[in-house]
């Protein structure tokens, strides 16, 4: 897919009900490629009450949405702006959230539910974790999440389809969101590894009384080139050896697509004290990333064996491990 700039839509409440103590505003960023975009409210000065959902890929383009809940005394009397930046297309867009209609007045008999952005539930679909897809011993899951479900109409029907054939193996749970007294419904569909890798399409269809028509969301593995990563492990720099803790680095370069999983082990046991960067797009269209592991210097000096494990679809058996330990005398 080619680089595509996003369209940005400000979302104001369906009706101007300011009788409640709070109001929810939204911002929809649609039709962009590739990731990422950054979205802030009032250039980052407004961060409380913000709920930004992960980007969803559909028809080779991404869509992302964010909502912010503020007091009725804040908006519309004060300006609230959604700021969107898409580095890949050098796009920067600022959209001010304007009231619908010339004035903000209560609009009886219409009742505008305060927690419901756009007057009803929203639906998002998420891919399986890459490690679950590529490791045959694990179980990949596609997830459909329905948010802003009213407690007055909690009954949500979710149907699943694989290549338009209905399946009935999903498990669905409902959770209450304390921050705005709505319900969140999560439906998890276990899938076959090969179904995802071969590009089959997964669709969830959601119905609820608050929806004028069922909402459908689809997802599949993005098409594109595959290139195996190069993995390099780097010992702590000499300047760091005066400290109690030292840093081991795993550099992973030249891979496509960006979906990758990296973890550390010490003598075969999983390490927890590591941090990974997000994959970064390189100038040739491939991706690179870093992972750093903080360890006690004495463990490194005692020549413990540390390993950086990488899971990616371009690798033989989808997995590789690079191990190293301190060389005696250093």
Curated annotation (Swiss-Prot):
<dbReference type="InterPro" id="IPR036179">
    <property type="entry name" value="Ig-like_dom_sf"/>
</dbReference>
<dbReference type="Pfam" id="PF07654">
    <property type="entry name" value="C1-set"/>
</dbReference>
<dbReference type="InterPro" id="IPR003597">
    <property type="entry name" value="Ig_C1-set"/>
</dbReference>
<feature type="disulfide bond">
    <location>
        <begin position="144"/>
        <end position="204"/>
    </location>
</feature>
<dbReference type="InterPro" id="IPR013783">
    <property type="entry name" value="Ig-like_fold"/>
</dbReference>
<dbReference type="InterPro" id="IPR007110">
    <property type="entry name" value="Ig-like_dom"/>
</dbReference>
<feature type="disulfide bond">
    <location>
        <begin position="27"/>
        <end position="82"/>
    </location>
</feature>
<keyword id="KW-1015">Disulfide bond</keyword>
<keyword id="KW-0325">Glycoprotein</keyword>
<feature type="domain" description="Ig-like 3">
    <location>
        <begin position="229"/>
        <end position="325"/>
    </location>
</feature>
<keyword id="KW-0677">Repeat</keyword>
<protein>
    <recommendedName>
        <fullName>Ig gamma-2A chain C region, A allele</fullName>
    </recommendedName>
</protein>
<keyword id="KW-0393">Immunoglobulin domain</keyword>
<feature type="disulfide bond">
    <location>
        <begin position="250"/>
        <end position="308"/>
    </location>
</feature>
<feature type="glycosylation site" description="N-linked (GlcNAc...) asparagine">
    <location>
        <position position="180"/>
    </location>
</feature>
<feature type="domain" description="Ig-like 1">
    <location>
        <begin position="6"/>
        <end position="98"/>
    </location>
</feature>
<dbReference type="GO" id="GO:0034987">
    <property type="term" value="F:immunoglobulin receptor binding"/>
</dbReference>
<dbReference type="InterPro" id="IPR003006">
    <property type="entry name" value="Ig/MHC_CS"/>
</dbReference>
<feature type="domain" description="Ig-like 2">
    <location>
        <begin position="121"/>
        <end position="220"/>
    </location>
</feature>
<dbReference type="InterPro" id="IPR050380">
    <property type="entry name" value="Immune_Resp_Modulators"/>
</dbReference>
